[in-house]
């Protein structure tokens, strides 16, 4: 039986300013039913008679209780891949199963055990999608060169998604986010894609989807949207994983990454700055967001992580207050993007970033994995990661 370790934290008491009590944690090994694997029939199939493990946990959503069982929705990312040598200036990746479709799954936690069940491939009217990088001529391209397991070059695919977060859409389906575009994707409960939103193309640009601010195209490659959550008022808040790299000049300097608000009913957007822990990192581009989850219409929980100046991983959960945060949309002008401003200049321009308070250090609770990518709120005192 294939297994993937996902620590599930319980008994983490939240008080919105500091922990009311010392948090505790329980860890579960998530198992998969016999036969649940990524099919692999490539050149080296004999070495993998049971296929490849399924990598869940790129997003996590608490969906309720069924008797004494806790249930969660989760999503995989773009599928099995491996680094390979650069081709000129371009990064390359080996996609051992290029036809892999990201999976929507359910996790059940009951009687001290956790199991991932009911895999549903993401698909559209043309059939199953895949996780391949986009073509090089569209917004959202990472300029990665994709290779097969035998190092044959693969074409970019504009139906490729690198899915990360998951949140309900209020209609029985879900919103997902993606690291490529970056994209917001609305799906039904069976994994069918209903709508996609991405950075709106400017003159002379080519886009797969629109409706989101054009500036988001400057996300660092493979660091697009990393987590999202639905607010009680129906807005979707989605986090850009790391600092934007505007004109390839701002990623190391920017003091914040962006939180994007999207109203599915009206299409209205807004953007807020989440202040990263700049002093902790060798460079600001090392900071990464892992996931977010809503507390109310103005407060979210957020995982900030990355290697610090001493090359040690840090995985922290913060409560983020958006009440006084400025909408950055009105400040985004060529040559005046806030990503290039220091604290003094931000203040002089009247730009206020979100406020934040540390809730818990996951490392202090025994978190061992490099990254935490799924965050779910079970109740007012309990989180799952």
Describe each region flagged by the PLM.
Residues 1-20:
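Gram-negative bacterial Sec-dependent N-terminal signal peptides
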Residues 21-385:
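Sequence/structural signature of beta-propeller domains
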